[in-house]
Amino acid sequence: MKAQELRNKSVEELNGELVNLLGEQFKLRMQAATGQLQQTHQLKQVRRSIAQVKTVLTEKAGE
């Protein structure tokens, strides 16, 4: 998701998105640990998405 799309969302929506991403990251990490994850680039994508959401939340907290 692009940063501008994230900035247009409310804080509640961003928190919901963050919870979803953290759950997805947990599932991917478990798959990687058991050797079931074929597309390892997904871990990087989810980690980056989490960072983007947290950044936008911090920006909104400063407003």
UniProtKB/Swiss-Prot annotation:
Positions of disulphide bridges: none
Record carries keyword Protein transport: no
InterPro entries: Ribosomal_protein_uL29, Ribosomal_uL29, Ribosomal_uL29_CS, Ribosomal_uL29_sf
Gene Ontology terms: cellular component: cytosolic large ribosomal subunit
KW Ribonucleoprotein (keyword) present: yes
GO MF term set: structural constituent of ribosome
Signal sequence interval, chain numbering: none
Record GO biological process: translation
Keyword tags: Ribonucleoprotein, Ribosomal protein
SUPFAM superfamilies: Ribosomal protein L29 (L29p) (SSF46561)
Family matches, as PANTHER family: 60S RIBOSOMAL PROTEIN L35/50S RIBOSOMAL PROTEIN L29 (PTHR10916), LARGE RIBOSOMAL SUBUNIT PROTEIN UL29C (PTHR10916:SF0)
Similarity field: Belongs to the universal ribosomal protein uL29 family.
Protein name: Large ribosomal subunit protein uL29
Gene that this sequence comes from: rpmC
